[in-house]
Amino acid sequence: ECKQTYFKKFMSRTNFQDLLNAEVHFGHMTRKWNPAMAPYIFTEQNGIHIIDLNKTVVKIDEAADALYQIAKQGKKILFVATKKQAKEIIAEKATSVNMPYITERWAGGMLTNFSTIRKAVKKMTTIDKMSNDGTFENLSKREKLQIARQREKLQKNLGSIADLTRLPSALFVVDVMKEHIAVKEANRLGIPVFGIVDTNSNPRNIDYIIPGNDDASKSIDIILSAVVDAIGEGLKERKMEKEKEQENNANEKQEKKAKGGRARIKRGENAELNANVAEKFLSEAEKEEA
């Protein structure tokens, strides 16, 4: 089956003018640049590198296509952004498509030591159970306070990944330089990395590069909106396919049931026919005896 890529089937998710208005094109000062970003730089202006937005449009579509496919398969994408201007955007966008996210400090080993992180999340769940089943009532005031503080800390750092029961299938990072530990862990485990990459960052360890301003909230918002829309559509497609599959299964069951009914009717007809034949045989036998 020939599959067209997502971004070819649909119009581009963004356009040059919208990205320009959102200041996606503003890079860092030329003296802070990373030469590996040269292919994505259009020019320099007043000592600042200007990103080629035509390339950004294409790269957003490529990332959107890949994320659409991941979401369609029912896999999880972990969003990471601990810088102030990106936190709220990431939390809002990731939550809208029921994806996990990290906006507080990245705990070393979040991916490479995932089993330990899961234990911490389970600890949080255990505390919640204690609170609900009345176990808390048997503790001293001091113990209650200690556990409550522990629960608060766990919620702050890990609450947004509480539903992540296995390693994510992809990582989406805002500011790959700031989140270099997360990128390194994903690289080590072979988890594909999607990232907004500014002119001062190294794109070499990023699988899906989106060249753009990773400091301005407007820039972060427009890029995130585009990729999250694609994820949402992937999830919608998955839901539709599941519903269709369930409908087909239900139809198959009904057909089998109907066939079984028809078979029973035939067996009934055969029994009646056999009884008539047997009656004739008996009648003939009686005549012969007479």
Regions found by a protein language model. Give the residues of each.
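Intrinsically disordered, compositionally biased charged tails
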Residues: 1-13, 233-290
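Ribosome large-subunit tunnel/peptidyl-transferase-proximal elements
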Residues: 7-243
